[in-house]
Amino acid sequence: MITLITGATSGIGEQLAIKYAEQGDTVIACGRNTQKLAKLGKHNNIETCQFDATNLQDIKAATLGYTQFDRVILNAGNCEYVDDARNFDSALFERVINVNLLSMGYCLEALLPKIVSGGQLVMVSSSVTYLPLPRSEAYGASKAGVSYLAKSLAIDLTDVDVTLVHPGFVKTPLTDKNDFPMPMAVTAEKAANYIIKGVAKRRKEVHFPYRFTLILKALRILPLSLWLKIAKGLTR
């Protein structure tokens, strides 16, 4: 099995690369950080591929030598919070949309044609898409786009299985900067285990940790006006 993973230089992506390699897959670990890629490349069964996921031509050039993949995991992403919605920062919004959503489109154009018939496409979104949360205007909008994109692809792709991943809080270098509590947060290693298990079963959606995501799913039955009142009361 040949598995390509974007955002493989840290967090969930790094753990996925290591674990799939340990299972015997040939892993193409992709990212921008050459030093971290070099470290990953020391593992057996891991090849590295350096590119910027927000640059279509960069992706195409870097992956030109690869003709097919059994599994592509689009995991690259970033998070920035809107601290002052009244003075909306469009540059911040553009950065987050570019990294989290537009990069998906670029990767799909470059990589989807190379996924073998019967292969798998895995797209990592976020459980933030279940409900609107404070300061998440940019991050939530970008991940909501990813979720809708994955669901539509699951309808239109007839020979590739699509798995949409909705993680809860995961302890990674990205979330280390969060200045608020992260209930039921799991390690990146545990998150990778959830994803690998769900992907192996070709689930349409993988969400975790289950208790946390099921609570969020249940809260969606509330009237929007009531949820907005609750959300306004959440601490920063």
Residue map of PLM features:
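Conserved glycine-rich cofactor-binding loop
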Residues: 9-10
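Rossmann-fold cofactor-recognition segment
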Residues: 43-57
